[in-house]
A protein has these predicted regions:
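Walker A (P-loop) ATP-phosphate-binding motif of ABC ATPase nucleotide-binding domains
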Residues: 2
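Hydrophobic anchor at the beta1->P-loop junction of P-loop NTPases
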Residues: 5
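The conserved Walker
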Residues: 8-9
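Conserved lysine of the Walker
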Residues: 13
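Conserved substrate/cofactor phosphate-moiety recognition/catalytic segment
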Residues: 16-65, 69
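Short, electropositive alpha-helical surface patch
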Residues: 84-101
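Small-molecule kinase domains that catalyze NTP-dependent phosphoryl transfer to phosphate-bearing small molecules
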Residues: 101-128
């Protein structure tokens, strides 16, 4: 299972990802995490154009697929502002759940397409 946590910068994606990882580990699951900021640093991808973002998300999705095949629960936390990019990522995985975190901020000249059919929409009223 791959959990894709999405939302604007500063919305709390990493916080929720870490809390979810802790809960899953306490239930006995082996968990792997991919965080957008950490992944970008690791891959040294400084290209924030659409092409660069797609390449980064594609690499992350492929890494998550390998871990999913190995039996891990995967938690990915990425801004992924375009619906088609999120769908591209999810197409790599056997089973996934989209988690949208509202709030946060966005870079100038960047539009965030909110999930229209999100499977789980977390709000400030949920305590993890």
């Amino acid at each position: 299972m791959v959990y894709l946590i999405t939302g604007k910068a500063g919305a709390g994606k990493t916080h929720y990802a870490e809390a979810l990882a802790k809960e899953l580990q306490e239930e006995g699951y082996q968990v792997r995490m991919l965080d957008g900021d950490t992944f970008r640093k690791k891959t040294k991808n400084k290209d924030y154009t659409d092409k660069g973002r797609i390449a980064n998300l594609n690499k992350a999705a492929r890494q998550a697929r390998e871990w999913e095949r190995a039996g891990y629960m995967i938690i990915c936390s990425f801004v992924s502002p375009r619906k088609k990019w999120r769908n591209m990522m999810r197409s790599f995985w056997k089973e996934s759940l989209l988690i949208y975190i509202p709030g946060g901020t966005l870079w100038k000249d960047t539009t965030y397409e909110k999930p229209t059919e999100d499977e789980l929409n977390l709000t400030h009223k949920i305590n993890i």
